Every structure is written in C-alpha cells, then in structure tokens.
Amino acid sequence: MTNAITGAAIVGGVCGQPIKHSMSPVIHNAWIAAAGLDAAYVPFAPAADRFETFVDGLRGGAVRGLNVTIPFKERALAVADTASDLARMAGAANLLVFNEDGSVHADNTDGPGLLGAIAIQAPGFDVTAAPVVILGAGGAARGAVAALLLAGAPRIAVVNRTVARAQDLADTFGEKVVAKGEDALPALLPEAGLIINATSLGLGGGAGPSADLTLTPKTAVVMDMVYKPLRTEFLRRAEAAGRRTVDGLEMLLRQAIPTFETIYGQAPSPKIDVRVLALKLLGEV
C-alpha cells in the first residue's frame, strides 16, 4: 500500500553511514500508508565529513524531522540549537526536529526505546536489581546509559576496546558509570543483570562481541541493538546459554513510535503490525 504525495507532503527521514540496512523507512512508510497521510520518510547517507553541512541544508522546513544513527549521534547533538534534557544528559541525539524559523531541536528516543523493548521481551526484568554491562561507547551507548540511570540502574560498566573513549562517556555521567577495557569482562559478567551490545559488531551476520555469556547469571538478560540479522551471533550465544534475549528490532520499533508522533503529529496506526512486516523483509518469517 502506497500513497501519492504532493508538494505539501510532510517529509521525515533517517541519516546514517551506512544506511542501506536501515528498516526505519519500511516502518515509518508503512505507518504513513496505513494512516493515508500526505507524507514520506526517506533514507539519507551523507559523507562522514559532510554531516553538519547536510543538516544545515535542511534548515527551514524541507524536512520536518530526521532520525540519526551510526556514526552521527554525538555530532547531531552538537549541530542542534536546542536539545531535550535526555539528549543533553546522553550527550547524543537520534532525532533532529527542523523548525520553521530555521532552528534545529535535538532529542533522544533511544533510551525509551531500549526500556520499552526490555518491557516487551523480558517482562518482569528489574533494571534496579543488578549492574549493567554495555559493550561500546558511541552515541547508542550514551542514550542507553542515560535512560538506564534514570530508570534506577545501580551501576553501569561501559566496556570498549579503546578505554579512553569509554572513560570520556563515564566522565559525563558520574560515579555510577565506570569505564573498562574488554579484559575486564570475566570479572564483570558474573554480576551483570543486563548485558547490551551497543556496537555494530554482528551487523550483516558477522561475529558479535566476544564476551563469554556463559559467565553471566542465569537470570541475566542479553540485548543486541543490531537487528539485521534479527538473531545475531551474539543473541544466539545468549540463547544457547539459556539467557533471556531482547532483539534490536523491538528497540527500533519502540523508539520509532515517539519519532513518528513528533514528525507526523499523530500516533502510528494500529491497522498494521510493522514488526511482522519488518520480519518478513528480514526473511525471518
């Protein structure tokens, strides 16, 4: 189902590098079609050194809103004129809203999307009960840390190959967040209640992070922000160890809802199950 659009169409989009794998256009355009809106949602892949120029070119209303993904989330916050409390706390943005006066507002729906996905796929999980381990220290990790702290996580270890990058993130958030190298994982995992892959490792079917998930408590939840493939190598290892898992597609769907509401001015239509649609396109059903 598709809609013809006019010159008055509301245009949204997603920006990243690479962007070909993104399911966001499928999700948003399905909601647009179901609602019969005069609107579109378009993928963009600006050169890595042209992101700020690209955003400046959209000021003034050509695009109503823009999702931002790897590797631009931290730069998205920096290019904005104003920002939500959550985006400022995270130090990163995954949504830019373009106002008629030419100003740009930054927001971050990654954290709420993460918590929403956990609530759906790991019901009853208590984020306040045990430490969290996050693999990666980029913009996605920043959004996760901000939301988890607000939700009451007692301690968060950010593990990154480059410890200095993890330390820069930890310094933003205070004493509850610590930076660690990958060699610290054997000591961290036995106490972790939640383990999150916030890197791009595993995208396209490659190997995920090398963490030994058999070291985690049997009650631990393992989450991967990567959603292509749906059952990443990281999640398959978690399942083999008997751990509950949360996939990246559910996080994408949960963060897409407030994005759609912001850009198009209404809630997504319940007429279509976009998860089923996305699963079909991923070859999962």
From Swiss-Prot:
Annotated NADP(+) binding sites: 85, 136-140, 160-165, 225, 248
Binding site for shikimate: 22-24, 69, 94, 110, 227
Keywords tagged on the record: Amino-acid biosynthesis, Aromatic amino acid biosynthesis, NADP, Oxidoreductase
Pathway: Metabolic intermediate biosynthesis; chorismate biosynthesis; chorismate from D-erythrose 4-phosphate and phosphoenolpyruvate: step 4/7
GO CC terms: cytosol
Enzyme active site: 73
Disulfide cross-links: none
Enzyme class at the top of the EC tree: oxidoreductase
EC number: 1.1.1.25
Pfam family, one: Shikimate_DH
Oligomer and partners: Homodimer.
Family recorded in the similarity comment: Belongs to the shikimate dehydrogenase family.
Function as written in the Swiss-Prot or TrEMBL entry: Involved in the biosynthesis of the chorismate, which leads to the biosynthesis of aromatic amino acids. Catalyzes the reversible NADPH linked reduction of 3-dehydroshikimate (DHSA) to yield shikimate (SA).
Protein known as: Shikimate dehydrogenase (NADP(+))
UniProt organism field: Caulobacter vibrioides (strain NA1000 / CB15N) (Caulobacter crescentus)
